[in-house]
Amino acid sequence: MTVRTMARTGAIGLVAAAVAVTAFTAPAQADSGSGAPKSQRHQGVQQAMDDLVKAGIPGVIAQLRTGDRVWNGTSGVADLQTGKPRRADERYRIASITKTFVATVLLDQEADGLLSLDDTVEHWLPGVVQGNGNDGRKITVRQLLDHTSGLFEYMGDPGYRKKFFTKEYLQSRYETWTPLQTVKVGLAHQPDFAPGARHQYSNTGYVLAGMIIEKASGNSYAHEVRKRILKPLGMRNTTLPGNSVTMPNPHSKAYSALSDDPNTTEYFDVTEQNGSQAFADGDIISTTGDVNRFFRALLGGRLLPAEQLKAMKTMHPNAGPVAGYTEYGLGLYSYRTSCGVKVWGHSGGASGALSETVATEDGRRTLSVNVNADWNWSPAIVESAFCGAKAAKAGKTGPIAR
């Protein structure tokens, strides 16, 4: 997302202390890509998770995978009322991490000859992108994926924000939305800049990307994700919710501040949400293990031909307003950690959930993290995973990609 700041501190009284659980699975393998021993990384990640809970987040889960060695960590609670601890295999809304799946599908469709990334939006969706200075004849599929289309971010619309980012959301979260309905919110505004002028994060473009997936294949967007990614990789814990409002089990509660006030201490259970409100810009539900499996396969060259993977990793400088990464390609961003390790991945923010998955360039080491709240995030988790326990301290960041 663009405008909503997701960094917020403030204690939640019902979380008196962290509930920390760690687990190791699979045999040890040779390590690569970091100057920190495994034990330091695991201890550092767990400490960063515990610190985030102490700072007021209900609960955190993470999985760090290096080769065939898997470490799972949890901290805090899944339910503020019962005190039930979080568990490592919980499903959560991965939000904008969905964008990496969407870009992968479109690139795979290109490899199959179904479309070209240089096709215009007008070619696939005639008459959809027009009015208020918007022109689908001048925007390519590639520009949707790398956020250089210039299309207005629909989540920045004042009416939309009132409906979905305030207490009104307690009712509106049950509404079913069509992709076209969502796109029209963005198209009611003039574009922010001419197509191709710069990178600027826009969910509007990814809704259109999902619509193009359907036009090019004759199948639903969900069908294409399952066909090209989930089934080949055996991702049995990953689902596309459609217009369902419920979460598959096991899952934690999702807590939202529903306010831009950084001093608020009032939080709401928003676990139930109509999945249609996100679509291809952020609807997927998954687990840390499944998302790690996806990024490992993607960056390891198992999902896309070399030409398409190279295109995905061709980066543009981040012009904002979303913080947290320095470059963005096609549904994939990158940045360097404090110790110089370059990581590739994506973050996601939904009401009641913040998540990130990052990996080394070859996908050998992958980290997936989820917090069941939307008001604070810690860069220390990633820093510790790739640089060691003393790399960073838990604290605030800017807006996370929504």
Task: Describe each model-derived feature in a short phrase.
Residues 49, 68, 99-102, 106, ...:
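Residue-level preference for non-acidic, small/hydrophobic
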Residues 1-31:
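Secretory targeting and sorting signals
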Residues 133-343:
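Short, surface-exposed loop or secondary-structure junction motifs
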Residues 58, 82-143, 193-202, 279:
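Short active-site loop at a secondary-structure junction
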